[in-house]
């Protein structure tokens, strides 16, 4: 369903068990947003602060966890769900948007930085996709947003971009965001791919992933590629991003903090020199 043009065809999710049925359309090129169309009584969950606009008749409610527990879940289940989000560094709370009006209503969610929104229909991937902890944007209510545990300590603590991964499970649509250009790769059985940890966005549950330390002291100290790779072994599908947010932020900070005062033709440096009288 994912395309490279400015918008997408309307997608439909047939909620088999738990997830609400939703329609959607993605707009834009490099600064995208997704518009969700809800029938009366349908809901969508989203990260706090992701909402762009919503029609009159949409009720917004902040909840513990993701609201995927059957029958609303008890206090223990809600605390467990919220605690899992806390481990990934996310907020304890999520926001639910429900159509309580008459007829179809729209609510939209915007990407936090330049890149692409990737719609994922979970039943196409055996009901489970693992993604970077900051990638999740929104999903049909009923989709569970949890964490993916790894037995090896190194994966959780030495992954650079954050290799405590989020786990999306259910039978509906989920939407994730990634920076720059998105590359989708299908790995054959046993095929191995080494990826910068920050460039990994998501993978299907058949893909085995781990952390591998960069070999060679010269590569470690002078390669500029970080100390670790993510190793991905098929079969399955992986989504990669060309511009991780931490890489973008580092470049902006380095240019604004140091090179702006150097005589390199920097606009910031020139303005600063004029103000200082240099």
Which ranges hold each PLM region?
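Short, Lys/Arg-enriched N-terminal segments with co-localized hydrophobic residues
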Residues: 1-17
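Composition-driven recognition of glycine/serine/threonine/acidic- and proline-rich low-complexity segments
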Residues: 15-278
